[in-house]
UniProtKB/Swiss-Prot annotation:
Pfam families on file: Ribosomal_L13 (PF00572)
NCBIfam families: rplM_bact
Species assigned in the record: Lactobacillus delbrueckii subsp. bulgaricus (strain ATCC 11842 / DSM 20081 / BCRC 10696 / JCM 1002 / NBRC 13953 / NCIMB 11778 / NCTC 12712 / WDCM 00102 / Lb 14)
Keyword terms: Ribonucleoprotein, Ribosomal protein
Name of this chain's protein: Large ribosomal subunit protein uL13
Matches recorded under PANTHER family: LARGE RIBOSOMAL SUBUNIT PROTEIN UL13M (PTHR11545:SF2), RIBOSOMAL PROTEIN L13 (PTHR11545)
Family recorded in the similarity comment: Belongs to the universal ribosomal protein uL13 family.
GO biological process, one term: negative regulation of translation
Amino acid sequence: MRTTPLAKTSEIERKWYLIDATDVSLGRLSTAVATILRGKNKPQFTPNVDTGDNVIIVNASKLKLTGKKATDKIYYHHSEYRGGLKSVSAGELLAKNPVKLVELSVKGMLPKNTLGHQEFLKMHVYAGEEHKHEAQKPEKLDINNLI
């Protein structure tokens, strides 16, 4: 009987991808990034091994929210004090801190365990055009071709 070859962490070659988020829907961007971070686009994907690549997202402030998500989608967090429930709409978060909006969206699509946290750390989001990862020679990736 043959066994499926499982990927080992030492054998995985990681690439760096650069994604421009200008006029891209938040959901489409997040699903594509989560797929790359998990490594599901690779033939040697193994669920219990971090096989994903590094992703750099630029122009997060130019994202597009479709429908009524700018007003109706609410993000909650609590200060741990009584009555400390805070809420902010997706439109307000996009205007104030677009990096946080992308991070929350992608983090919700990754596993809720230590492997998911390890995969999340390979994502680098920037609100503007500039980023500090030129030394890694990232490969430009078009989101429209992935989905």
